[in-house]
Swiss-Prot record:
Primary location: membrane
Catalytic activity, EC: 7.1.2.2
One GO MF term: ATP hydrolysis activity
Localization per record: Cell inner membrane
One of the Pfam families matching this protein, by short name: ATP-synt_ab
The protein, known as: ATP synthase subunit beta 1
Native species: Bradyrhizobium sp. (strain BTAi1 / ATCC BAA-1182)
Binding residues for ATP: 154-161
Subunit structure and binding partners: F-type ATPases have 2 components, CF(1) - the catalytic core - and CF(0) - the membrane proton channel. CF(1) has five subunits: alpha(3), beta(3), gamma(1), delta(1), epsilon(1). CF(0) has four main subunits: a(1), b(1), b'(1) and c(9-12).
PANTHER family: ATP SYNTHASE, ATP SYNTHASE SUBUNIT BETA, MITOCHONDRIAL
Top EC class of this enzyme: translocase
């Protein structure tokens, strides 16, 4: 066992984010956290390799400028530990659990190591259950599994962040669950904007001047683009550790990762720094193992669930690139946001034909839901096929049957839009949470032609089908 004296080592070499530390007689275990001071600040190093009998190679969690050879380093005897519990809600912490929102220390229930084993088979729940999000297009066509993993694809400016905010808001309201947002290697400006948007849209309370009527629903963990690769490779684990603690206390937790590609990218940088031989396209040889170690911890246990929504950047739009291809293997559902739908003013801009889910099976969602979803996709697919003809020859050249299909498809498309709670402050229209039964009923009536008499505009930005009928009456009265 290590005594206090031999828990102290000395730095022998610093190469960028890699620091070698020599210990006499006792070597810290792999993944142990070592601490030193750099310009008065705490610097955490994580043991990655043992070199020879007395030296460990570590990855720094912050910048290493200013470190000198011979400097003392202390072995903490445990992996990196971060604060967990309700004290983290509404706060921003970094990879090592320090608050970075200038609102004082985090009031944590306890500390928990960021490296944990995935739950054993006996602890996992095997029931296939749907997480109702209250967002019509998602619940109908690509339903999320409780404890599942969802990939969120979308370019810049199509509404990824607003969709994420609405999911956080709805899960908190409908399921009483908390959320954890891990910003992995993305822009610091976006992280800052997100933090302030969460406060404005009442997802979180402002820690600087708290409003007693607002309860924070989301913890934020950031390791942004400017951080060294060590921090970016570990920040997703820090966020996951906070989520696991909520889950073990019986919560249904939402865990957001933006962006899962940056986790792989940081892993590849660390791997190169450690001198490992790269594999395909320059990625780390342990790519699948690293991804598996993270993803296998995201699951439903007998106590609670972690449902994860992961934004996935696809480098050069190449879906066969090893990084996105490895993450696809773990996904239960994909939600694809489309620019062409956003251009029509239909929000959320979810592509109904490109979004998929493993849960959309009659055995899980039931015969009626499955049949309605497939009919909706059929109508939209037919409309898509007819668009070229409409563009060249116009609507008049279509058969009566096709005209009816187009009219219904356009109504279905508009009915997929809905006002969001988190966008109320911008749009002025109150947000809507639509129950699954109402969603199925509405779309079923639409594809069966029950609402053929209503104008298209009646279906735009409403919640349930009853609201669309009301809006239709109002529009008719105004026109009369």
């Amino acid at each position: 066992m290590a005594t206090a004296a031999n828990q102290i080592g000395r730095i022998t070499q610093v190469i960028g984010a890699v620091v070698d530390v020599q210990f006499e007689g006792h070597l810290p275990a792999i993944l142990n956290s070592l601490e030193t001071k750099n310009a008065g600040n705490r610097l955490v190093l994580e043991v990655a390799q043992h070199l020879g009998e007395s030296t460990v190679r570590t990855i720094a969690m912050d910048t290493t400028e200013g470190l000198v050879r011979g400097q003392e380093v202390t072995d903490t005897g445990a992996p990196i530990r971060v604060p967990v519990g309700e004290g983290t809600l509404g706060r921003i912490i970094n990879v090592i659990g320090e608050p970075i929102d200038e609102a004082g220390p985090v009031k944590a229930d306890s500390l928990r190591a960021i490296h944990q084993e995935a739950p054993s088979y006996t602890d996992q729940s095997t029931e296939a259950e749907i997480l109702v999000t209250g967002i019509k297009v998602v619940d109908l066509l690509a339903p999320y599994a409780k404890g599942g993993k969802i990939g969120l694809f979308g370019g810049a400016g199509v509404g990824k962040t607003v969709l994420i905010q609405e999911l956080i808001n709805n899960v908190a309201k409908a399921h009483g669950g908390y959320s954890v947002f891990a910003g992995v290697g993305e822009r610091t400006r976006e992280g800052n904007d997100l933090y302030h948007e969460f406060i404005e849209s009442k997802v979180n309370a402002d820690p600087h001047n708290p409003d007693p009527s607002v309860k924070s629903k989301c913890a934020l963990v950031f390791g942004q683009m400017n951080e060294p690769p060590g921090a970016r490779a570990r920040v997703a684990l820090t966020g996951l550790t906070i989520a696991e603690d909520f889950r073990d206390k019986g919560q249904d937790v939402l865990f957001f990762v933006d962006n899962i590609f940056r986790f792989t990218q940081a892993g590849s940088e660390v791997s190169a720094l450690l001198g490992r031989i790269p594999s395909a396209v320059g990625y780390q040889p342990t790519l699948a193992t690293d991804m598996g170690a993270l993803q296998e911890r995201i699951t439903t246990t007998t106590k609670g669930s972690i449902t994860s929504v992961q934004a996935i950047y696809v480098p050069a739009d190449d879906l066969t690139d090893p990084a996105p291809a490895t993450s696809f293997a773990h996904l239960d559902a994909t939600t694809t946001l489309s620019r062409s739908i956003a251009e029509k003013g239909i929000y959320p801009a979810v592509d109904p034909l490109d979004s998929t889910s493993r849960m959309l099976s009659p055995l899980v969602v039931g015969e009626e839901h499955y049949a309605v979803a497939r009919q909706v996709q059929q109508v939209l697919q037919r409309y898509k096929a007819l668009q070229d003809i409409i563009a060249i020859l116009g609507m008049d050249e279509l058969s009566e049957e096709d005209k009816l299909t187009v009219a219904r498809a356009r109504k279905v498309e508009r009915f997929m839009s809905q006002p969001f709670h988190v966008a109320e402050i911008f749009t002025g229209s109150p947000g809507k949470f639509v129950e699954l039964a109402d969603t199925i009923k509405g779309f079923k009536g639409l594809v069966e032609g029950k609402y053929d008499h209503l104008p298209e505009a009646a279906f735009y930005m409403v919640g349930t089908i009853e609201e669309a009928v009301e809006k239709g009456k109002k529009l008719a009265a105004e026109a009369a």
